[in-house]
């Protein structure tokens, strides 16, 4: 004896498609990468580390040098989008999001050296962590509600 049941599986198939999108992760990690960029730009603007600690002021001699070269703006920033702040680059994939600085000297500023204080600009502050949590909660909520 053969019994066959037919069901409308379109709703279930849609859920699986949504789940596959989440499992791919690119939409979520793209949004997370955007938060990483926003955070770095904020830290450049506020001249502070992700922890909230203000960057150490520039040495007076170096300030004079920068001023003479026409760089009268904020620390680690040069007009026209050049320099460290303008070299930020993003990447993301199925299960990662990252940000970096294309300028070779970015690591020296991030970590500091014997002769230069650290001026960290990469990382997440409290706002960034909250925003990423909100992105994840929103994505999971949308997945379970549809």
From Swiss-Prot:
<comment type="similarity">
    <text>To phage Mu protein G.</text>
</comment>
<protein>
    <recommendedName>
        <fullName>Mu-like prophage FluMu G protein 1</fullName>
    </recommendedName>
</protein>
<dbReference type="Pfam" id="PF05069">
    <property type="entry name" value="Phage_tail_S"/>
</dbReference>
<dbReference type="InterPro" id="IPR006522">
    <property type="entry name" value="Phage_virion_morphogenesis"/>
</dbReference>
């Amino acid at each position: 004896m053969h019994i066959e049941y037919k069901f409308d599986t379109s709703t279930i198939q849609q859920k699986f498609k949504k789940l596959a999108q989440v499992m791919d992760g690119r939409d979520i990690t793209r949004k997370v990468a955007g938060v990483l960029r926003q955070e770095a730009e904020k830290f450049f603007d506020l001249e502070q580390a992700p922890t909230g600690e203000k960057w150490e002021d520039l040495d007076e001699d170096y300030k004079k040098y920068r001023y003479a070269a026409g760089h009268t703006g904020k620390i680690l920033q040069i007009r026209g989008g050049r320099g460290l702040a303008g070299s930020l680059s993003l990447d993301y994939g199925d299960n990662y999001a990252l940000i970096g600085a294309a300028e070779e000297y970015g690591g020296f500023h991030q970590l500091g050296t014997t002769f230069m204080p650290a001026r960290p600009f990469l990382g997440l502050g409290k706002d960034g962590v909250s925003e990423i949590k909100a992105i994840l909660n929103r994505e999971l909520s949308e997945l379970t509600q549809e």
